[in-house]
Amino acid sequence: MHRPAATGPSRSAASHGLTLSGDELWQPDSAQIERVDELIRGYRREVVTGLEPSVRAHYPELLEDPGGEYRKMLELSTKMTLVGHACCEIAGYPYDERRRLNGTLFGCCCFLADSFIDDFGPDATREYLERIELLLTTGWFDVRTPREELFYAIVSRLFAARDVLDPILRQAILLLFEAQRRDTELRLGDAIASLPRRELLTLLRLCARDRSGHAITVLTGFVAPEIELSLLPPLFTAGALIMHIDDHGDCFSDLRHGRLTYLNQVRNPAATLRRIFLEHIARLHAGLPANDGRDLMVAFLTRYFLTRLEKHRLERKRSDSAWAVYE
Amino acid sequence: MSAAEPLGDVIALKIQELRGRQSTARPLVRIDNREATANAPFQFDTAEACLHRNGCCAIPSGSRTALYGLWQIPPQARAFACPTCRPGDDDEDEMASDGVKDYVFGMLSVLDQFGSVIRERGREFRESAEGRELTAGLDGLYRNLEDRERATLQVVLNSLDTLLSTVAELDKSFDGGRSHNGNGAASRNGDGGHS
């Protein structure tokens, strides 16, 4: 859930031979894929309206867009707004303006939190994890920079928008934090080098699953007033799938930065991702109530899967850009 | 405060500044409930869609990081019951919270912790340009209300007033000779300085 949605040429799932034996009902038709594209275009504009005033008020330097960071933030927030749409309708609630804004704010929050953890070196990563844990355990966050001010303003707005002490939402937030910390420890520690290959792959797969699986649950908690317990497993599955798709798309840039993921360590990543995609989609389709939210989620995942396969293919050719695919 | 900065952002950021003004470090709000959830009687495995009793040996090791603690079994979760531990109503428990009472104690704790600072800030803010603007805005809002809406608002304000009086009374009776502000001094409920 932590990288922007790259969108490319629209193609149906069937044209890529994505069939499930005995059940092809899940496959989105071209109208459903087109709806995803339309929503993405609309949300892109809405996200700018929703985020720019806060960025201007707290961290105007970001608008100068050094390294395309602001655009990346908008893209991630757009993707989160769209996934939030699917989650909200899956949970049985209309996706109104206020809920859309919550989806957008959560995207912005994830982008900034990821930047704290990824972009300022190992010492800063550890310190940020400690400070975020302090925020979660005491509510205190010592704001030191404009970027942190923007982060805290967004977090506090999200926390005020929902009952953050709801038992499921607060557990999802803590589970997401723990997943993020395990992922970071894995990257920064030495233990990973001595693990047998099989164990390493299991660990990487679970890490990917948990990070995005819990993130989508938090997102749902912020866009929907209540989540029925029976929806948690399929939502978790959807989140895990998004992370694997993301990791495949970012394969070459992750390898350049020394970041191991399940999808950049398996022997045949494209075939592995295809198998994961089909398995996860089948579980999702069977586990979710038949409604517009489910259809939107499946269409988005299919679209995302296809575009990230394309991104992976392009990056293999010109492996000099981490963010090669934009519309 | 810049023109585009929402009032909520300002309040949230100002609250963080209060941290350094506490005589004793105390939490503002604790979202972390890991300890309570680890001890909840049921654990819902979101990776495998299975509801277990706490400590069930059938919980897969790969699911340990995807468990949600539950105190009661919602009707829709019964379909996911683990066949090994067979979770049932007999183990249901109350969550470690007490509903409305928690809110009352929460309000008391905020008043006790930050009462003097909030009052001081309120005075400063009322006299600032933004505060005057807000006061004018609220007056305008009140003037534009229909009679019925005004009556409703009055009922709400009266109820709030009654609630605050009740809280103050409760505070006095709970306080009775012991301090609850954690620093050994009698609670002043915001009247004294908390330097």
Regions found by a protein language model. Give the residues of each.
Chain A
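Active/binding-pocket-proximal capping segment
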Residues: 236-242, 251, 255-265, 322
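All-alpha helical catalytic cores of prenyl diphosphate-utilizing isoprenoid enzymes
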Residues: 47, 63-86, 96-102, 109, ...
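Primarily interfacial, aromatic-capped hydrophobic alpha-helices that serve as membrane anchors
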Residues: 142-171, 271-316
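C-terminal intrinsically disordered extensions
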Residues: 2-31, 181-219, 305-327
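Generic, well-ordered alpha-helical scaffold segments in large soluble proteins
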Residues: 115, 119, 218, 222, ...
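Divalent-cation-assisted or electrostatically stabilized phosphate/pyrophosphate-binding catalytic cores
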Residues: 125-156, 196-210, 255-288
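Structured alpha-helical bundle/scaffold domains in large eukaryotic membrane-trafficking regulators
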Residues: 121-124, 253-256, 260, 296, ...
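Conserved N-terminal diphosphate/IPP-binding helix and adjacent helical/loop segment
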Residues: 1-108, 112, 116-120, 125, ...
